[in-house]
């Protein structure tokens, strides 16, 4: 498959604290920010119908970097994390030295682990390079079943395979997906995330048909999503055997949508300042 790893979606309870963590601890930058008055037709913001926002944040343009999508539902101020998400791996000597000076734990692989305000873990390793998201790690219940889905059904090549974990990627230089065998049953709870990939627009329907033929799970069938003042995109939302959510979005539309917005950070700060949603509860 000709796919491109794009981003991982986090639902967050406190937008201000979250943005502070990603910009001041992990040195990321706000790339674009969008506000929506009603829930996403492809459940991009989770199973919620109210007002929400999307903030893309990362180390560079979405054409060249795997980034994060920060989803904030105005009426929701608490999520419960499950054991589906494991960590995101970022390597950079500069970032490693910075994290060494703050509260962290040492992971088994020698990286430094830190958590965002919602409890999502990030593992920071050493590398003579600018910070780059290398890998998304998720837990799975049945490694072989998960491998078959990602490698055979979704056509993601295997980079490295071990007895308890498998690394895969759609291409050199792309962010990898690492599936890790869990000893516990996977429970996604309310804080579950979603990983996104781009795919040629004219092949999205055939991908959907392939998933149907394989009796795979389709959360949202192929649909067009509108973003006020920006490009429309086509998406289909799938789920793997452990219900990890997967978005495939048309590459052409997404490249038009995902241009860096120089006004995004100031717009985000203004929306945070005006946010009185805690009073709604």
From Swiss-Prot:
Annotated InterPro entries: GLOD4, GLOD4_C, Glyas_Bleomycin-R_OHBP_Dase, Glyas_Fos-R_dOase_dom, VOC
Top-level taxon of origin: Eukaryota
GO biological process: determination of adult lifespan; methylglyoxal metabolic process
Keyword Phosphoprotein (UniProt): no
Domain (VOC) ranges: 4-127, 132-251
Transmembrane domains' residue ranges: none
Swiss-Prot/TrEMBL keywords: Repeat
Family: Belongs to the glyoxalase I family.
The protein's name: Glyoxalase 1
Gene: glod-4
């Amino acid at each position: 498959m000709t796919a491109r790893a794009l981003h991982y979606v986090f639902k967050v309870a406190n937008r201000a604290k979250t943005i502070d963590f990603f910009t001041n601890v992990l040195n990321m930058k706000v790339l674009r920010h969008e506000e929506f008055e009603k829930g996403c037709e492809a459940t991009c913001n989770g199973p919620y119908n109210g007002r929400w926002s999307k903030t893309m944040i990362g180390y560079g343009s979405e054409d060249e970097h795997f980034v994060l999508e920060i989803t904030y539902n105005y009426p929701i101020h608490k999520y419960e994390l499950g054991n589906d998400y494991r960590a995101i791996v970022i390597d950079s000597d500069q970032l490693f030295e910075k994290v060494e000076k703050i509260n962290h734990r040492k992971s088994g692989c020698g990286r430094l682990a830190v958590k965002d305000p919602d409890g999502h873990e990030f593992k920071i390793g050493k590398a003579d390079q600018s910070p780059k998201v290398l890998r998304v790690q998720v837990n799975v219940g049945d490694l072989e079943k998960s491998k078959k889905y990602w490698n055979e059904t979704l056509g993601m090549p295997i980079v490295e395979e071990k007895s308890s974990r498998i690394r895969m990627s759609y291409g050199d230089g792309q962010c990898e997906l690492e599936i890790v065998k869990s000893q516990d049953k996977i429970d996604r709870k309310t804080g579950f995330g979603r990983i996104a990939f781009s795919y040629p627009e004219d092949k999205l329907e055939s991908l959907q048909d392939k998933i149907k033929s394989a009796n795979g799970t389709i959360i949202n069938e192929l649909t067009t999503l509108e973003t006020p003042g920006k490009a429309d995109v086509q998406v289909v939302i799938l789920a793997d055997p452990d219900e990890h959510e997967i978005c495939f979005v048309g590459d052409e539309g997404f490249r038009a949508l995902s241009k860096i917005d120089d006004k995004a950070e100031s717009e985000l700060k203004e929306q945070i300042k005006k946010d009185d949603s805690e009073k709604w509860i």
